Amino acid sequence: MHETTPYDVIMAGGGLMGCATAYYLLQADPTMKVAIVEMDPDYTRNSTVLSDGNMRVQFNLRENILISQYGMERLKTFSEDMAVGDWRPQVDFRQQGNLFLADEANKANALAGLALQQSLNCEVEWLEPAEIKARFPLYDE
């Protein structure tokens, strides 16, 4: 007869979201029994590793901006926070930026989002078409 281990939570997938959820559940209640079921135990071919991920703050919803800001702050100390003995996980994150384009029909909504982002100390700016063309000559009108 096989013995079974009862778990409070079983995470299906151990990518970024699965591992983060398990981590924060255990931070909230260290007595909780959490299991992560991941098809790629070496973490060499799972969705997080293979993604060309992007973190951004250009949202029109305050909560989304705050979540992104929190994630960016956590990345700064992630290797130290997740250290096990002398081993430190390697974080290969390179912050670059994004360029979002808006047509006249969506300009007011984009400007409202910009104001919200700036009110939350996001480093974002509005560029007019001529400024975009000067900074990014690959884009043509």
List PLM regions with ranges.
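A structure-centric signal for secondary-structure junctions around beta-strands
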Residues: 6, 31, 49-52, 95-96
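The feature captures the short pre-catalytic strand/loop hairpin that immediately precedes
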Residues: 141
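Glycine-rich FAD pyrophosphate-binding loop
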Residues: 26-49
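Flexible, glycine-rich phosphate/dinucleotide-binding loops
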Residues: 18, 43, 108
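Short, flexible hinge/linker loops that cap or flank conserved catalytic cores
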Residues: 1-4, 28, 93
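Beta1/beta-strand and adjacent pyrophosphate-binding region of the FAD-binding site
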Residues: 2-17, 35
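Dinucleotide-binding Rossmann-like beta1-alpha1 core, especially the glycine-rich loop
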Residues: 52-138
